[in-house]
Curated annotation (Swiss-Prot):
InterPro entries: Asp_de-COase-like_dom_sf, CT_Nitrate-R-NapA-like, MoPterin_dinucl-bd_dom, Mopterin_OxRdtase, Mopterin_OxRdtase_4Fe-4S_dom, MopterinOxRdtase_cofactor_BS, Periplasm_NO3_reductase_lsu, Prok_molybdopt-oxidoreductase
Binding site for Mo-bis(molybdopterin guanine dinucleotide): 85, 152, 177, 181, 214-221, 245-249, 264-266, 375, 379, 485, 511-512, 534, 561, 721-730, 805, 822
Pfam families listed in its UniProt record: Molybdop_Fe4S4, Molybdopterin, Molydop_binding
PANTHER family tied to this protein: PERIPLASMIC NITRATE REDUCTASE (PTHR43105:SF11), RESPIRATORY NITRATE REDUCTASE (PTHR43105)
4Fe-4S Mo/W bis-MGD-type domain: residues covered: 41-97
Main localization category: periplasm
Role of this protein: Catalytic subunit of the periplasmic nitrate reductase complex NapAB. Receives electrons from NapB and catalyzes the reduction of nitrate to nitrite.
Residues noted as binding substrate in the record, renumbered to the chain: F797
Protein name: Periplasmic nitrate reductase
Organism: Pseudomonas aeruginosa (strain LESB58)
């Protein structure tokens, strides 16, 4: 058998993915032929549906179904490679329990909160939704309605939802599930640089000498990027890899400097590195003097718990968490001076020689460094601080905004950047880094959206965790979720999430593809189209915006989230949802539907259906009579063009494998803030952090503070949650792929063998994991990929039959409002020895 190099690479990649899923050799080799003229397949590009890496795949369709996918060899991100999840993308839409009709809880032919789900029409679904929304708005105003969205929304779905709630219904109670994963990264960027999102790109991987992973298991969570890191490490002898985590995982296999630290002490390690840089004379004085100023952040800021919690009452600055005062470099140096090597080794548990070697990676002026982090940093009661502290290190050394020198926050969802952050679907944000609390920002949005001045409320809406609390307390009464599964993914679900959803005064709508845990707890389920059943756009972790066409039809009566949002807007007139004083400013809008005002406004509807590329279906174009995706995108792009968030024209993205913003004069930007790469940086300045008026970044003096909950005599173990390679988030897609489910069918309790021995457990024992909030049953694993130190257990959250978030604590970072899923106290109880 003679294979070309390309054929061998494709066969090898397929074999690796199949082996990971436990497939036999014959099946592995059965679909290596991909040529369209041989197979009668039609191939098109699309970004992968899973993580924030943003891999591009080629999607094969035949007879109205997706039948195969493979890595896109033209894609800069993944270069033809996929991870094991990506290789099974063709199966995620075809689970046997796919939702295809709206379902309402009913008894005796009417809605009943305690009734059974029965199929209804879309007309009936929108009837009861409109009834519930209008009743709540009339009785209690905009604060009584809300929406929980997603970093998996397409760009235009998130944008339409943002408009509908913030301008149409005048409620800022819209927040994405990205609050649980990226909010601390957002606030870290905003505080340090005055603008959100990374300054670097994936090209840094091939340009650097050092990789430092902080709370990031890239080998399993970003495996395609990890393949590039591995290639760089193995092909260049000077390259070093440091990995820091609270437990050992697969990324440690490549580590030159492996470090397992005690939970929360990453703050101490970060301050020690800054101190080492200063004490050893490694500060890049010229860079710091020209480009950095210093500030002391508020301390003792609480833990984002309910106001009556003792920890919140005790905190001195819970209401001033995001404040700071200016200091100088000398004061900053004095602040970090107590974070010595000896103290850091003692309190973190990391050997001193490894800590010093890590600090010297950063301090060495001849060595380039890329710092990667994900949920270990962000899901942290001091996650914003952790982000600020890593920026301190890169700013002190000047190792930033240039090839191979980059602090890089990796995202977990395919459009947490593109939709949640850039579109501004958080409860405090508007597109392009604008915020609802700023009058000028509201004015900008109102002008672009062509709504009267004063339409957008200045009060920040309820964030994700607060939404659950407000549902429970009866403040929030009508709640719509799309592309999210918060009943499984939210923290402390039994005490703070489920009670609000089942509160008889509340009405909860879930739009989803499968009957998830959240869907089963709802009152109304709306069947959604997914991935290539609709035209879409995602924005990945390196600011790359990627488009795809609709390639197949959704099954049954399933509809895209965009169609649901826009069609539902027809059910409201301005008279029903806007006060008289607002309508008096724009009498021409009186009596019009929100659909007319928001989506038939002369901007969104200005592109005719004929603009759609030939040969592609588009159900929303058919439904509304114009190219709504193009209209929404171009209106949204107006927020950022000329302001450092420039997006290319709509049609350019269908031709490219994504473009990294800002895109100016057709050219994408790889490194922001650096002259020669970023068009917004003035000639001769070298570097400009133009998010702030003085074009300087801020280095923050921030201390170590303890976690909200720690092990004690009654609950002697730390619990950390997270993911595994084969599953994505709550498993609602991957658990329906037989090969992935077979590979990892159950969530396990990973623990140290000595802890198991002392508790008289063994591998396979069934145990209870118990906290002050709830408990689950699962089996013990003392071997395998995750190796916790003594005193810590790790349980992934993909398993709908083992809801580990019954156990977790709903403490959040007080600045970002992001949940800490990595640190709470539990005990382990034997149920069955096995």
């Amino acid at each position: 058998m003679n294979l070309t190099r390309r054929e061998f690479a494709k066969a090898n990649a397929a074999a690796i993915a199949a082996a990971a899923a436990g497939l036999p050799i014959l099946v592995r080799a059965s679909n290596l032929v991909t040529e369209a003229d041989v197979t009668s397949l039609v191939w098109n590009k699309a970004p992968c549906r899973f993580c924030g890496t943003g891999c591009s795949v080629m999607v094969a369709t035949r007879d109205g179904q997706v039948v195969a996918t493979h890595g896109d060899i033209k894609a800069e991100v993944n270069r033809g490679i996929n991870c094991v999840k990506g290789y099974f993308l063709s199966k995620i839409m075809y689970g046997s329990d796919r939702l295809t009709r709206p379902l309402l809880r009913m008894k005796d032919g009417k809605f009943d909160k305690q009734g059974e789900f029965q199929p209804i029409s879309w007309e009936q679904a929108f009837d009861i939704m409109a009834e519930k929304f209008k009743a709540a708005l009339k009785a209690k105003g905009p604060e009584s309605v809300g929406m929980f969205g997603s970093g998996q929304w397409t760009v235009w779905e998130g944008y339409a939802a943002n408009k509908l709630f913030k301008a149409g219904l005048r409620s800022n109670n819209i927040d994405p599930n990205a609050r649980h994963c990226m909010a601390s990264a957002v606030m870290g960027f905003m505080r340090s640089f005055g603008m959100d999102e990374p300054m670097g790109c994936y090209d840094d991987i091939e340009a650097t000498d050092s990789f430092v992973l902080w709370g990031s298991n890239m080998a399993e969570m970003h495996p395609v990027l990890w393949s590039r890191v591995t290639d760089r490490r193995l092909s260049a002898p000077q390259v070093k890899v440091a990995v820091l985590s609270t437990f050992e995982h697969r990324s440690f296999e490549l580590a030159d400097l492996p470090m397992v630290f005690k939970p929360q002490t990453d703050l101490i390690i970060l301050n020690y590195i800054a101190n080492h840089i200063i004490e050893s004379g490694a500060v890049n004085r010229d860079f710091v003097e020209r480009h950095v100023r210093f500030a002391h952040g508020a301390e003792d800021i609480g833990y984002g718990l309910r106001p009556d919690d003792p920890l919140e009452k005790k905190a001195k600055n819970a209401d001033k968490a995001n404040t700071w005062s200016d200091i100088d470099f000398k004061a900053f140096a004095e602040f970090v001076k107590p974070y010595t090597l000896e103290r850091t080794a003692r309190e973190s548990g990391v050997p001193a020689e490894r800590l010093k070697a890590l600090a010297e990676l950063y301090a060495d002026p001849k060595r380039k460094v890329v710092s990667f982090w994900t949920m270990g940093f962000n899901q942290h009661t001091r996650g914003v601080w952790a982000n600020n502290l890593i920026y301190n290190i890169h700013l002190l050394t000047g190792k930033i905004s240039e090839p191979g020198n980059s602090p890089f926050s990796l995202t977990g969802q395919p459009s947490a950047c593109g939709t949640a952050r850039e579109v501004g679907t958080f409860s405090h944000r508007l597109p392009a880094d604008l915020v609802v609390t700023n009058p000028k920002h509201r004015e900008t949005a109102e002008k672009i959206w062509k709504v009267p001045a004063g339409t957008i409320q200045e009060k920040v809406g309820f964030h994700a965790v607060q939404q659950s609390r407000m549902l429970k307390d009866g403040v929030l009464n009508v709640y719509w979720t799309q592309v999210s599964n918060n009943m499984q993914a939210g923290p402390n679900v039994m005490q703070e999430v489920l009670p609000g959803w089942r509160n008889p005064d509340n009405f909860v709508i879930v739009s989803d593809v499968y009957p998830t845990v959240s869907a089963q707890a709802a009152d109304l389920i709306l069947p959604s189209a997914m991935w290539v059943e609709k035209e879409g756009a995602f924005g990945n972790a390196e600011r790359r915006t990627q488009f795809w066409h609709q390639l197949v039809k959704a099954p049954g009566e399933a509809k895209s989230d965009l169609w649901q949002l826009v069609e539902f807007s027809k059910r409201f007139t301005t008279d029903e949802v806007w006060p008289a004083e607002l309508l008096a400013k724009a009498p021409e809008l009186k009596g019009k539907t929100l659909y007319d005002v928001l989506f038939r406004n002369g901007q969104v509807d200005r592109f005719p259906a004929s603009d759609l590329a030939k040969g592609y279906a588009n159900d929303e174009v058919d439904a509304f009579g114009f190219y709504i995706q193009k209209g929404l995108f171009e209106e949204y792009a107006a927020f950022g063009r000329g302001h450092g968030h420039d997006l290319a024209p709509f049609d350019a993205y269908h031709e490219a494998r994504g473009l990294r913003w800002p895109v100016v004069d057709g050219k994408e930007t790889r490194w922001r803030y650096r002259e020669g790469y970023d068009p917004y940086v003035s000639k001769g300045s070298g570097v400009q952090f133009y998010g702030y008026p003085d074009k300087k970044a801020i280095a923050f003096a921030l201390p170590y503070e303890p976690p909200a909950e720690a092990p004690d005599q009654d609950y002697p173990f730390w619990l950390a949650t997270g993911r595994v390679l084969e599953h994505w988030h709550t498993g609602s897609m991957t658990a329906r792929v037989p090969e992935l489910y077979k590979a990892v069918p159950d969530a396990l309790v990973y623990m140290h063998p000595e802890d198991a021995r002392q508790l008289k457990l063994r591998r396979g024992s069934e145990v209870k994991v118990v906290s002050r909030r709830g408990e689950i049953r699962a089996r013990v694993e003392t071997r395998g990929r995750n190796k916790p130190p003594q005193g810590l257990v790790f349980v992934p959250f993909f398993d709908a039959n083992k809801l580990i978030n019954k156990v977790t604590l709903d403490a959040t970072d007080p600045i970002s409002k992001q949940t800490d899923y990595k640190k709470c106290a539990v005990r382990i109880e034997l149920l069955n020895l096995a």
